[in-house]
Amino acid sequence: MGRDSVVKETTLESFLAEKSVKRGDASWKKTIGLNVHDDINGDGEINALDKKAAGDFDLWHEHAVDGVGHRWGMAIDLTSCIGCSACVTACHIENNVPVVGKDEVRRHRDMHWMRIDRFYASDWDMERGEKEGVGVISTYGKMEEPGANPQTVHMPMMCQHCNHAPCETVCPVAATTHSNEGVNQMTYNRCIGTRYCANNCPFKVRRFNWFHYPGYDKFQNFNPAQDAIQRMVLNPDVVVRSRGVMEKCSLCVQRTQSAKLEAKKAGAPLEDGSAITACAEACPTNAITFGDLNDTSSEVRSTYDNNRTYHALEEVGVQPNVAYLTKVRNTPNS
């Protein structure tokens, strides 16, 4: 598991040359293989050559998700993302995410439902290491060396709303559960703050409330909701979390519920685009697409089925409802 398991990138020349290649066979999006204790290749031996695709493994019993009601999902195009953080700001405003200040960030107590991860391209990769006979460990060391003119990849990262979420299986009080619409949801009144879910999350997107930020004088200089007038900046549709509970991205569940109610009152089916998250609405480059994955005519479904689409840390097998589209450059990654 390395950088390529999280962020994928390629050049325009390479992408066009392999555009029609079956997903998983392209050089820029190889299917991840995991070793198994079985004679997969039929050579009569069990060794390191016996591998299965990460998507063929399943640690949990399957349950129907396709074509059953709504299934909210998101697709993020890394080629379009410019790392402006407009989505992060919109998320803070929409979901009453507190501003904790630089002192708390210094203590690793930052509070964001989504963040922008930044990756720099290297002159080295595993293929170059193999060609030049450099060991794996030495290759990783050389990959840390900055290039003369490194390229950057911006990657929005939030809760991936996994269908097989590892956070749900470790919570001792069932404070984090999975809705029948594919959303990993939090029950704040049930949460006792063990932080087991944060430890078990492979994407590290869960945050803990160390204080009651809207009511603590220490944060009054940068947290506006400290008195009755300033509290009017808060979104009344989203609960203000108390001290000692976990919180994370909810895929703006208040917005999807509102869109469903409006459609029900109108006696019409839910139209594609009527439910949209704050981050997708604020994105100036339309890099974020949100909608119902079970709606075959939806924009998010067509984006999801794009040949560039992949899941971060696919080999973990958590089956996220958030997908990314491979970054395509006009110039080489150097």
Question: For each predicted feature, which ranges?
Answer:
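Non-ligating segments of multi-cofactor redox enzymes
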Residues: 1-334
